Amino acid sequence: MKDRLIIVSPRQYGYQTDYLKYVEYLSEKYRVVFICLNQGEKKFECDKAEIKYLKLAGKRSSYLWFMIYTFVYITFHSGKVMTTNFSGCRYLKKILPWRKMVVNIRTVSVYKDSSKAAAQNERIRKDALGFDRIIMISKGGAEQLKLPMKKVDIVGLGADVISDTPKTYDSLRLLYVGTMNHRDIPKTIRGFHQYLLASDDSEATYDIIGDGDEFQEIRDYVTANNLSNRIIIHGRKRYNELKPYFDKCNIGVAFVPINEAYRHQPPTKTYEYINSGLYAIATRNQVHEETVHKDSGILINDTTEEFCDALKKIRQTKIDDTLVRNGGIPYLWRTIVMDELATSLEKI
């Protein structure tokens, strides 16, 4: 009989790639139970774990019900506990101090306002300190939060090969997948528009998948400039719906602002782009400088002008999709989960 692993996350199962992959691979080693809120999204079919959906009501009552249910379940069921970092997660460990638990922090604060960022980072730090182990996305992020390194294990981001379709790069077909909160994606829209005006690339397209605060600004720009046949806005898609877009496209947009908030934070999709043969346009943060090389992508500053210039350079560059894919081999999800995450869980 496998040992039980209880994963706690207010976010509905299936809409965080990391946790989809954790369940997929950790189920080989553990009997996984995933406790989450039902946020009204379409449910993922899952035969590798027991998914416990808790009905979403009002914000406060849902959170309270989520916490009560989780306390009761953990109390009466043995097994290791891994929780996502969410506001108040510290109380799981405070109320059940005898249970071995690890908290998994996937991001530091990304607020542009420095005082808000500092306050959120301090909340994340305080929530994490009481746990037996702390999983962090990068060493730089752990240092930024001033976490005790003796309790920290680094578990990076991973990627699967979403598409094995051979790529050519004669015409540029861009893809952005991710959030549109605080990412400055409108800069890439304007940069792509400038590229279209200056280029003879008559078949260039830009597919955008995701949602967030910038969504309406992007839609308005596309409409105002009659770009709907070149810039296609798809809204939110589930992970298992992404393959046709990775098959179609050959350039992956890994664009985050260059500031303290994102200095140690890789966009989740960067590695998926590279592993699927999409040459990456990546903003020049510390993590991208360590992982995106000349055979797999181009590094830029976070401006409209440099985004446009990068597209022009890519069009003139001879790119080999085999070399692009080779750059992503160290970041395959199986390696990340079974070598890094499973090792961390064995410590509790």
Language model feature labels by segment:
Residues 5-8, 135, 165-196, 207:
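Conserved donor-binding/catalytic core segment of Leloir-type glycosyltransferases
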Residues 13, 183, 240-242, 254-272, ...:
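Nucleotide-sugar-dependent
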Residues 24, 67-76, 103, 115-136:
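Membrane-proximal helix-turn-helix segments that form the acceptor-binding/catalytic region
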Residues 38, 91-92, 122-152, 159-161, ...:
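A short, active-site helix/loop in glycosyltransferases that binds the activated sugar's phosphate group
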Residues 82-88, 105-106:
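Short His-centered aromatic/hydrophobic patch
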Residues 219-243:
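Nucleotide-activated donor-binding/catalytic signature segment of Leloir-type glycosyltransferases, i.e.
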Residues 294-305, 312-318:
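Conserved acidic donor-binding segment of nucleotide-sugar-dependent glycosyltransferases
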Residues 302, 315-348:
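A charged, aromatic-enriched C-terminal amphipathic alpha-helix characteristic of glycosyltransferases
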